[in-house]
Every structure is written in structure tokens, then in C-alpha cells.
Amino acid sequence: MSDSKSDGQFYSVQVADSTFTVLKRYQQLKPIGSGAQGIVCAAFDTVLGINVAVKKLSRPFQNQTHAKRAYRELVLLKCVNHKNIISLLNVFTPQKTLEEFQDVYLVMELMDANLCQVIHMELDHERMSYLLYQMLCGIKHLHSAGIIHRDLKPSNIVVKSDCTLKILDFGLARTACTNFMMTPYVVTRYYRAPEVILGMGYKENVDIWSVGCIMAEMVLHKVLFPGRDYIDQWNKVIEQLGTPSAEFMKKLQPTVRNYVENRPKYPGIKFEELFPDWIFPSESERDKIKTSQARDLLSKMLVIDPDKRISVDEALRHPYITVWYDPAEAEAPPPQIYDAQLEEREHAIEEWKELIYKEVMDWEERSKNGVKDQPSDAAVSSKATPSQSSSINDISSMSTEHTLASDTDSSLDASTGPLEGCR
């Protein structure tokens, strides 16, 4: 919009402690979530005639970390196009020049709930396996673009009442680092893999550990490894899964290895005891077979040593998951990331600001030319789920509240209720 941008295109509304200055096309703003990265409102898009989520990035230029994350999120959202990853519908700023530039608004699909609201419900095998399949498809698509998430958790995965699932964000930047001995919990890290906790190198199946933790929580209705900090979480991991082998210990940095080797030794608990038959659905002989398959999948995902952990492709072909396999979803063409140095870029804050401003202006220019002024197919409709049975086509009744909030489990509006129909 640059020079043609006028104050008359925008209006301001107070949302909690923040002022949203948005395009007039977005009406009926209602706060639905907040976190370290921003505040999210549900709104009605009067141009497209659909409900959307409007996210205001919180102080994107307060430091280099925030600025880099904002740039990374914007670039990736513009490039990624997959039914199991949230769609970006619009990007704008009310400021007219680079010098004034302070606020970034992202407009995305509006979903019905995040996984926190579904994960403790009584899900049958059909629903559970379909949700996991979609997670794996979304993860594989990110991996195909060289994006390894490393921070998957229920609060950044969203669902609709028809059981469709989407990943909200793109996780930790490759340059993000952690200090095993010193890092406290700033956000939920119950789902982070041992190699992230221990400061090791990692590969794509780092995200499989997170899926395993999420699946375990679906089954147990409680967090599997609820550590107070990284050290406490590591202790909870080895208490349940057992102390890893000497071969694994050799892969650790000396200071970390010294700590880990001096912990008490644990034999681990059998998966049949961690996940006994009675906690799974068991209404039929078929359920009993699926229970055995589900437990086998858990045992292959929740493996401390990443070299022995199942891969994303292997998980998609596992008997518990493969019933849903569709090449169009699981083998979708990779997104073309146009910034090859995205993960490695380091800039001063003002340089990040200019890069982000250029991305916003690029979007606005393309929108004026008609490139981006239509909703994505995923935003207004979704392909029927593979099953035609009513049990999977309805995670209903969904709350009438909606969500698109990712940073913390507590970010959801308290009025957003569980999905009653799945109980």
C-alpha cells in the first residue's frame, strides 16, 4: 500500500492490554489467545466472507531474537502450502513508512480448538490415528523444505470439528541454543527430544519424539514427562524409559555426559506397563489389534537414542497409521523457500526491520495485483476425511470458540471449552 495507504483504511480497537489497528475489512475482533510471540483475535473478514484469526506480533523489533523469529515466521508462512499447516491469508501493517514501521499483523485460518482441548478426551483408535497421521504429513512437508521443528506441542497444533489438523508454527530456529544445566522453563518443553535437552546434534526424527509424547498424552490423559526444568525432565525420561546405553553416552558433550553418567541407573518400565491394555479403547477385537499397534508405534517413537528411533517415513507406513496414507498428502511437493540463508541469517535489529518491512510490502503489492486476495482452499473448505464413517467425520460438538494461539498452553481464552462430542 505504501504511498496509497491511508488512515481511513484502518480502525483501532482495544484488545486486553493491546491496541489492534487493523484494516476495516476485519470486523468483530474478539481475543482468543496470547503468548510470547503475539496476541490473537478472531475476526470476520467482510471481503472474503469468512472467519479468520488476526495475530499481532508482540514487539517484533524489541531484540534480534524476536526480529529473527518474526522474519522467519513470515517467510515460511508465505512459502508453505499444505493442508496440515496453517494457511496465511493476509499480512499488513498500519504504518506508512519504514521509519514508522512497528507493527506486523498476520491473518490466518481460524480453527476450532487447539490440541490441548482434545488431547484429554476419550479418543477412539480411528480418531487418534487420523490426528497422528495428519501431524506426520505436516511434519514431513516441513522437513522436505529443510525445516526441522524441534518444538512440537499440543498448543501449537490446531484442529477443526471434522477432525482436520494443522500445525501452527515452525518451531525453533536452527540457530537457537539451549544450555542443559542452566535453562529453566520459559515455555512448555515437555515434548522436546533428548537430543534437544542434552544439546546434541539432531536430525529430522527429533520431531518424532514430540509426536510420541503427544500420542502418549492422548492415551494417558496426562503429560508423560512433566519436568520442572531440563534436568528434572531428563530424570523423568530415564526413570520411565531406562538409562541409555554407553554407546549413546559417547555422543554427549563431556560436561553433559559427566552429569548424565552420574545419575542413578534405571532399568526402565516395559511399554506394556506404561501403556496397559485397559487405557486404550477396547470395545471390539479390532480395537485389541489396534491397541497392540498403537503401543508398538509408541515404543518406536519414544526411543532416547535418535539413531534407533523411527523416522517420519517409517511412522507414516506403520500399521497403526498407514490406513490413512494418501500420496497427495504424505508426498506433497516441497515448498520453495526463496531465502536460502533463512536459518543462518544474523542481522542488527534495524536490518531485520527492513527485511520484514520488505516482506510485508511485497505481500501488499501482490495483493493489489490480485495474487493473494483469495482464501486458500483449506481456509474455506477441506477434503473429506479418508473415512466415511460418522465416528471420524465428527469430533463434534466443537466449542463455538475458535483458536489460533501457540506459545503456551495457558494462552487460550478460558471460555473455550472442550469438544463435548468426543467424550
Swiss-Prot record:
The modification Phosphothreonine is found at T183. Keywords: ATP-binding, Biological rhythms, Cytoplasm, Kinase, Nucleotide-binding, Nucleus, Phosphoprotein, Serine/threonine-protein kinase, Transferase. Residues 26-321 form the Protein kinase domain. Induction: In T-cells, following T-cell receptor (TCR) activation. Levels peak 48 hours after TCR and CD-28 costimulation. Residues 387-416 have a biased composition (Low complexity). One of its GO terms (biological process) is positive regulation of apoptotic signaling pathway. A motif (TXY) lies at residues 183-185. Activated by threonine and tyrosine phosphorylation by either of two dual specificity kinases, MAP2K4 and MAP2K7. Inhibited by dual specificity phosphatases, such as DUSP1. One of its GO terms (cellular component) is nuclear speck. The keyword RNA-binding does not apply. All four isoforms are widely distributed in brain. Isoforms alpha-1 and alpha-2 are predominantly expressed in hippocampus, cerebral cortex, caudate-putamen, amygdala and the granule layer of the cerebellum. Alpha-1 is more abundant than alpha-2 in the periaqueductal region and the substantia nigra. Dually phosphorylated on Thr-183 and Tyr-185 by MAP2K7 and MAP2K4, which activates the enzyme. Autophosphorylated in vitro. Its EC number is 2.7.11.24. Residues 366-423 are annotated as: Disordered. It comes from the Eukaryota. Residues 366-375 have a biased composition (Basic and acidic residues). The keyword Nucleus applies. GO terms for molecular function: ATP binding; JUN kinase activity; protein kinase activity; protein serine kinase activity; protein serine/threonine kinase activity; protein serine/threonine/tyrosine kinase activity. ATP binds at G33, S34, G35, A36, Q37, G38, K55. PANTHER family: MITOGEN-ACTIVATED PROTEIN KINASE. Interacts with MECOM. Binds to at least four scaffolding proteins, MAPK8IP1/JIP-1, MAPK8IP2/JIP-2, MAPK8IP3/JIP-3/JSAP1 and SPAG9/MAPK8IP4/JIP-4. These proteins also bind other components of the JNK signaling pathway. Interacts with NFATC4. Interacts with ATF7; the interaction does not phosphorylate ATF7 but acts as a docking site for ATF7-associated partners such as JUN. Interacts with BCL10. Interacts with CTNNB1 and GSK3B. Interacts with DCLK2. Interacts with MAPKBP1. Interacts with POU5F1; phosphorylates POU5F1 at 'Ser-347'. Serine/threonine-protein kinase involved in various processes such as cell proliferation, differentiation, migration, transformation and programmed cell death. Extracellular stimuli such as pro-inflammatory cytokines or physical stress stimulate the stress-activated protein kinase/c-Jun N-terminal kinase (SAP/JNK) signaling pathway. In this cascade, two dual specificity kinases MAP2K4/MKK4 and MAP2K7/MKK7 phosphorylate and activate MAPK9/JNK2. This is Mitogen-activated protein kinase 9. The lineage of its organism: Eukaryota, Metazoa, Chordata, Craniata, Vertebrata.
